[in-house]
């Protein structure tokens, strides 16, 4: 008996093609959704990602010109100095690129950290780089083992609380080694060794500044022993004329800007620049003052502009960033504006020299 020939069912074939087509469309939709979702996630990550570290050379260039601020008072007796978000915005508008927080208090509460982080966030939102500096006055006055450990513990706690902050936030271990510790080089270097080792446990690549003995003068840089855990993310802070020039003190004399007076400034900068080249440790000037505001205010604004103009030119010449000392000398926090008489002075330092 002859077998029947197979019958081709066109309708079944058409239905099969249709189902296959629909399946591919659905798969494409799913893939499209996954792709869009992945791109959105990646875009958000790129937009919000922070670099894991900033090299000292790059950080030095980022700092440019800044100002020391007393938002946390001037001693352990008072944690509250003049501060406002409006002031931060005014600073940024003036061309200021970084601020140094000078902290004096050994006991930081959760509320204190909340306030500190709020100030840091406001700075970051306005493109101001925050530098956290510790005064450690009791240690400087009496640098014994007990005070040594208190400073190390302070930085341990600060580092733990700041470990997730942007790498733009840096640590300045001691504001001007003065009093007894200014001559105790071995103790100061020992403190730096211990503080850096402690900080590195939670902040392996955050920029840390160490300051030389002898009131942070550049001549003291040669006495610094670089901490073993510096690991390439260590810088040095030095300064001169932190309380302004003087018309009588030969060490920081400035009258009319004579060749001899200018040479004093050039000599100090050269000492720091030579040390920087020799050690490959980049530096920053943490404080200089255009006038002797704390010691009689003996300079006219015109004289201050002449001094500030030369200082700025010389530091700019070698790419050394700096902070002027200090905020409330130039900014009126009650009126929320720069003190009018210093407008040209500030422009000389922060704007005109950058143009």
What are these regions (language model features)?
Residues 37-44:
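Bacterial N-terminal signal peptides
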Residues 296-355:
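Aromatic-rich peripheral "rim/lid" segments of glycoside hydrolase catalytic domains that contact
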Residues 152, 156-291, 310, 317-323:
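Active-site region of glycoside hydrolase catalytic domains
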Residues 67-83, 103-107, 144-146, 245-264, ...:
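Acidic/histidine-rich helix-loop elements
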Residues 2-3, 28-34:
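Positively charged n-region of N-terminal signal peptides that target proteins for export
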Residues 85-138, 149-153, 157, 191, ...:
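Aromatic-lined substrate-binding rim segments of carbohydrate-active enzymes
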Residues 50-98:
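N-terminal carbohydrate-binding accessory modules
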